[in-house]
């Protein structure tokens, strides 16, 4: 009798376990592709060519001007055919997180930590290109400069 109860309990457990499991997903990850080193360099060169372009809130074209995320979207689309998110908050989760000591040309630099506020494109030698503020222009700045060195920095590699 005890064996019959054990067998019934085991069958019930197996049925419940089968009902509780979900089929393996066939969807691929939404993670963007990793750019090659050459594509990353091309993005950095393209970004440097836009230095001096006027800042414009919400802007994402050479003629209309750029804000920081519009600059990033334009550069990666034109130089590598890559679509990027259009807000700094979304850029903070885009691509792979990279330790700062592994920063390479073409990586995204995102400032603000838990609440991202600004982003740019790293171009090497501790410099990055960004569209900083209303009334300004796309410019080249240093990560170790007096202002930017005090900001929380995350690095993302698309």
Where are these regions (language model features)?
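A structural motif
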Residues: 40-46
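Bacterial Sec signal peptide processing site at the extreme N-terminus
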Residues: 13-37
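Sec-dependent bacterial lipoprotein signal peptides
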Residues: 1-19
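Short secondary-structure boundary/capping elements
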Residues: 38-39, 147
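Catalytic cysteine-centered active-site loop
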Residues: 33, 53-105, 153
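...with weaker cross-activation on analogous glycine-rich loops/strands in unrelated enzymes
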Residues: 31, 82-143
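Glycine- and charge-enriched low-complexity intrinsically disordered segments
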Residues: 148-158
């Amino acid at each position: 009798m005890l064996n019959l109860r054990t067998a019934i309990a085991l069958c019930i457990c197996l049925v419940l376990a089968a009902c509780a499991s979900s089929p393996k997903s066939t969807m691929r990850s939404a993670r963007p592709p990793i750019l090659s080193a050459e594509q990353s360099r091309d993005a950095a060169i393209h970004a440097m060519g836009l230095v001096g372009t006027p800042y414009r809130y919400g802007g994402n074209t050479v003629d209309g001007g750029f804000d920081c995320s519009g600059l990033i979207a334009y550069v990666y689309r034109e130089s590598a055919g890559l679509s990027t998110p259009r807000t700094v908050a979304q850029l903070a989760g885009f691509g792979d997180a990279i330790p700062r000591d592994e920063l390479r040309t073409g990586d995204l630099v995102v400032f603000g930590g838990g609440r991202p506020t600004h982003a740019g494109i790293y171009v090497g030698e501790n410099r990055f290109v960004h569209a900083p503020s209303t009334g300004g222009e796309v410019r080249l700045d240093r990560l170790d400069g007096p202002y930017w060195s005090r900001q929380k920095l995350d690095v993302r590699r698309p």
